[in-house]
A protein has these predicted regions:
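Conserved catalytic or regulatory cores that recognize and/or transform ribose-phosphate-containing ligands
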Residues: 1-115
């Protein structure tokens, strides 16, 4: 949009600190940054406690789909891959970004999925 690249952050929500650091850095570099709505592997995990299994499944599916829509809005994704860790959901997001022609950037260099 305008002179600004839109970048969606992808990665395990266990890396909340890194998400916040990268979000700040990319914003100060002149990017519009889209991040996750909650950090389910950190203190936000309480959100799941009172959900029945059906609601939990639907909610997680909705959040996964919403993240793909965030990628649709973006020019690029930025993968938060601390220690080289890339989980299954993040791998799926990387593949989706590739299929839709998005630039893919990584916090840490990796050879994962560069076949």
């Amino acid at each position: 949009i305008g002179n600004y690249k839109i970048v969606t952050l992808c990665g395990s929500t266990r890396f909340k600190r890194e998400f916040l650091e990268v979000q700040k850095r990319l914003t100060l570099e002149g990017n519009i940054v889209i991040s996750v709505g909650l950090f389910s592997h950190s203190e936000d995990n309480k959100v799941w406690e009172n959900m029945d299994e059906g609601t939990l499944t639907k909610t997680k599916s909705m959040l996964d789909d919403m993240h793909k829509r965030k990628i649709d809005l973006s020019d690029a994704i930025y993968v938060i891959n601390v220690g080289g860790y890339i989980g299954d959901n993040t791998k799926s997001e990387i593949e989706y970004a590739k299929m839709t022609g998005k630039e893919i950037m990584y916090l840490e260099s990796t050879n994962v999925l560069k076949r």
